[in-house]
Design a protein with these regions (language model features):
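Short, low-complexity N-terminal intrinsically disordered segments enriched in polar/charged residues
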Residues: 4-52, 163-175
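A beta-strand edge to alpha-helix "cap/lid" segment located at domain peripheries
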Residues: 21-25, 29, 85-175
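Short, mixed-charge, low-aromatic patches
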Residues: 32-42, 68-72, 88-91, 113, ...
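Hydrophobic pocket/interface hotspot
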Residues: 37, 49-50, 58, 78, ...
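Intrinsically disordered, low-complexity regions enriched for glutamine and histidine
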Residues: 42, 57-58, 130
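A solvent-exposed, acidic/Ser-Thr-rich amphipathic alpha-helical stretch
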Residues: 47-103, 108
Length: 175
């Protein structure tokens, strides 16, 4: 009886410790994937992100009222959107400040907080804090909700437009 109690204690303690210290292997893998995807955006390799996006169900929403805002429901539009980000803010870098992962492979919620920085073409520094809420199902992203300071985005796009990047004021990419 003591052996059973000891085994149960070890299992419960071990699971509690794993949850407390976030050693869930699936969650670690998802965090690494998210960091790699932000790096792909920085390095102008948006095609690499598309393998992790659902072919069937997709919703990508970026808050605001500018050339980057709106909602996309297909991979082709999402890829064009990522390419636009790279064109209008070519030096954009992300510092991921926190990633939280909840759930298992059949329904995963990722919350990624970040600070985006670059220098605009007029030399002005650009800094914007934001958060992604990403829903994954069986390894594929099905929903992205992106929130940031929309005034900062709009100002940055206006500066880039004035410096000659006409796509900074192009119509939204929506589908």
């Amino acid at each position: 009886m003591k052996t059973i109690a000891l085994v149960l204690f070890i299992l419960v303690f071990g699971m509690s410790a794993a949850l407390a210290f976030d050693v869930n292997p699936y969650h670690k893998m998802v965090k690494k994937l998210v960091r790699n995807n932000f790096k792909s955006i920085e390095e102008h390799r948006p095609e690499e992100i598309m393998d992790g996006v659902s072919d069937k169900t997709l919703e990508h929403s970026f808050a605001g009222d500018n050339s980057l805002s709106g909602t996309r429901h297909d991979k082709e539009s999402l890829l064009r959107w990522f390419k636009r980000v790279n064109k209008v803010l070519p030096e954009l870098k992300f510092e991921i400040t926190d990633i939280q992962v909840k759930g298992g492979p059949s329904n995963t919620l990722v919350i990624a907080r970040w600070t985006a920085t670059c220098h605009l073409l007029n030399g002005e520094p650009y800094e914007n804090k934001g958060v992604h809420f990403i829903t994954l199902k069986w390894g594929k992203a099905i929903k992205f909700d992106v929130y940031e300071n929309t005034k900062v985005v709009s100002h940055g796009l206006e500066v880039q437009y004035q410096a000659g990047i006409l796509e900074a004021k192009a119509p939204k990419i929506e589908s």
